[in-house]
UniProtKB/Swiss-Prot annotation:
This is Interleukin-12 subunit alpha. Its main location: secreted. Pfam families: IL12. Glycans are attached at residues 42, 96, 110. Belongs to the IL-6 superfamily. Heterodimer with IL12B; disulfide-linked. This heterodimer is known as interleukin IL-12. Heterodimer with EBI3/IL27B; not disulfide-linked. This heterodimer is known as interleukin IL-35. Interacts with NBR1; this interaction promotes IL-12 secretion. Residues 1-25 form the signal peptide.
């Protein structure tokens, strides 16, 4: 029987905040880190920096749009679509590997983050889940930025450095990653709602970027 998603989330958050860095690294699903993993760690660190900078700019520019973490309605666009928190759990918290492997996520095996032939299925699932998260946010951000670019006020746009950081980490996780251009839908276009949605997504994505960066750090140290 698979443990409830809520319990898994609480467990991983407790571990991330209270367990020793190297101790946790030793207990994660094992893999052999190589130069590619170090490169992926650099990409994840750059992603965290750029999304933090983008969020800070949005909070300043959209100060009248309720853009602080205390004011927004938090939303996770990856809910029920990916399993990053569960897939990247330490082994002792995920004794039933089949519970995770049964998730409908395509395994990636052609990225540079793992040494070919030396990654466990759970480690591959962890990185595959991270890739799926990035892909979902990439689609949302690019569609949103396309709308912001036609805003007559031209008040705010997404930082290209953040979009590039997403692309680079996705490519490191999957060599076949492709960027799909997004065209804005003009039906029911509301720039105010778009900017509020931007704040919500940036806050959620920064939290996910923190998780991704920690996971990459643990994998690189293991």
């Amino acid at each position: 029987m698979c443990p409830p998603r809520g319990l898994l989330l609480v467990a991983i958050l407790v571990l991330l905040n209270h367990l020793d860095h190297l101790s946790l690294a030793r207990n994660l699903p094992t893999a052999t880190p190589g130069p590619g993993m170090f490169q992926c760690l650099n990409h994840s660190q750059n992603l965290l920096r750029t999304v933090s900078n983008t969020l800070q700019k949005a909070r300043q520019t959209l100060e009248f749009y309720s853009c602080t973490s205390e004011e927004i309605d938090h939303e996770d666009i990856t809910k029920d679509k990916s399993s990053t928190v569960a897939a990247c759990l330490p082994l002792e918290l995920a004794p039933n590997e089949s519970c995770l492997a049964s998730r409908e996520i395509s395994f990636i095996t052609n990225g540079s983050c793992l040494t070919p032939g030396k990654a466990s299925s759970m480690m591959t699932l962890c990185l595959s889940s991270i890739y799926e998260d990035l892909k979902m946010y990439q689609v949302e951000f690019k569609a949103m930025n396309a709308k912001l670019l036609i805003d007559p006020q031209r008040q705010i746009f997404l930082d290209e450095n953040m979009l590039t950081a997403i692309d680079k980490l996705m490519q490191a996780l999957n060599f076949n990653s492709e960027t799909v251009p997004q065209k804005p839908s003009l039906e029911g276009l509301d720039f105010y709602k778009t900017k509020v949605k931007l704040c919500i997504l940036l806050h959620a994505f920064r939290i996910r970027a923190v998780t991704i960066n920690r996971m990459m750090g643990y994998l690189n140290a293991s």
